[in-house]
Regions:
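Conserved alpha/beta-hydrolase "nucleophile elbow" surrounding the catalytic nucleophile
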Residues: 58-60, 120, 124-129
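Conserved HGGG/HGGXW glycine-rich cap/lid loop of the alpha/beta-hydrolase fold
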Residues: 42-90
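Conserved serine/cysteine hydrolase catalytic core
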Residues: 209-251, 260
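Catalytic active-site module of serine/aspartate enzymes centered on a nucleophile-bearing elbow/loop
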Residues: 255-283
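Active-site loop/oxyanion-hole signature of alpha/beta-hydrolase fold enzymes
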Residues: 81-123
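Alpha/beta-hydrolase fold catalytic core
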Residues: 1-53, 77-78, 118, 279-283
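Flexible "cap/lid" loop of the alpha/beta hydrolase fold
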Residues: 130-138, 143-173
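Conserved alpha/beta-hydrolase catalytic His-Asp/Glu region
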Residues: 157-159, 171-227
Length: 283
């Protein structure tokens, strides 16, 4: 019995839409199922075999398919391993260990081992950024560089929008669309972004997101990051105070490349080329 979907039928519907999106992956790719201690982990591999390796992690409710709008840019110069996280939609095991535990760092160790990568750069967005940060702090020797896009765990979490989202849930499809519009907060959307947005709406019709609070990394911990870091924040993010996050990261890591887009929300556009350039010379 599924632990992350409201019904088994709903889980099947999400996976069918997921597979349909993967069929439209814009670059050559290879699906992989990796063995880890938590269970099977699904990944989509793209990009030149000899390019710098990058493990890409999406946020809550996200899958490898959510990289669809940016994968062509990233995979032009990087070997991208787009990994479905445990307990999230997609085709990875549904286990959800506590976020504050070492379980996710151990899981990512297993992912790297299964891919035969002693180390790799990490790219994470939202909760995926939290997992990338957690791994970088626990296993610095395995993280060559860190690229973050509106990561969780640095800036303060905004509570008021969560209350609105809870209210919108009572209004079915209209409520889900209203919630997604709030999160997008005016971010420009091309055809692929709209397609991924529709998939997100369909996912949250059936998916039960984590209710656990995401642990916050204090400045003192962020100061321990020893690898090159690039971070992109949207000042209009309704979920996280990313202006606060950018200030904290600049305080902790004066040499980091920290960018704050004043007119962008949680779905941050236009970061992929900068990340590809940043990670392109690292392995």
């Amino acid at each position: 019995m599924s632990t992350i979907y409201r019904t088994e039928e709903g889980g099947r519907a999400v996976r069918q839409r997921y597979d349909a999106l993967l069929d439209r992956w814009p670059v050559p790719h290879e699906p992989r199922t990796l063995s880890t201690q938590l269970g099977d982990t699904f990944a989509v591999v793209s990009g030149p075999v000899d390019a710098p390796p990058v493990v890409a992690l999406q946020g809550s409710g996200g899958t490898a398919a959510h990289w669809l709008p940016d994968i062509a840019t990233l995979a032009g110069s990087l070997r991208v391993y787009a990994v479905d996280a445990p307990g999230e939609p997609g085709r990875t095991v549904e286990a959800r260990p506590p976020l504050g535990s070492a379980a996710y760092a151990e899981w990512l160790d297993d992912v790297l081992d299964a891919l035969e990568l002693p180390r790799a750069a990490f790219l994470g967005t939202s909760l995926g950024g939290w997992w990338a940060l957690d791994h970088a702090l626990r296993r610095p020797e395995r993280v060559a560089a860190l690229a973050l896009v509106n990561p969780a765990g640095i800036g303060r979490r905004r509570v008021a929008p969560l209350l609105k989202f809870a209210g919108y849930r009572l209004f079915g499809g209209w409520g889900r669309r209203r919630s997604l519009a709030m999160v997008a907060n005016g971010s420009p959307a091309g055809p692929e972004q709209r397609e991924v947005g529709e998939f997100t709406l369909a996912t949250f019709e059936h998916f039960k997101p984590r209710l656990e609070a995401v642990p916050e990394f204090p400045v003192e911990r962020l100061h321990e990051l020893v690898m090159p870091v690039q971070a992109h924040f949207g000042a209009r993010d309704v979920l996280l105070d990313q202006r606060d996050a950018a200030a904290k990261l600049r305080q902790a890591l004066p040499d980091a490349d920290v960018r704050l887009a004043e007119d962008a929300g949680h779905f941050l556009p236009g970061w992929a080329a900068a990340v590809a350039e940043f990670l392109g010379g690292r392995s």
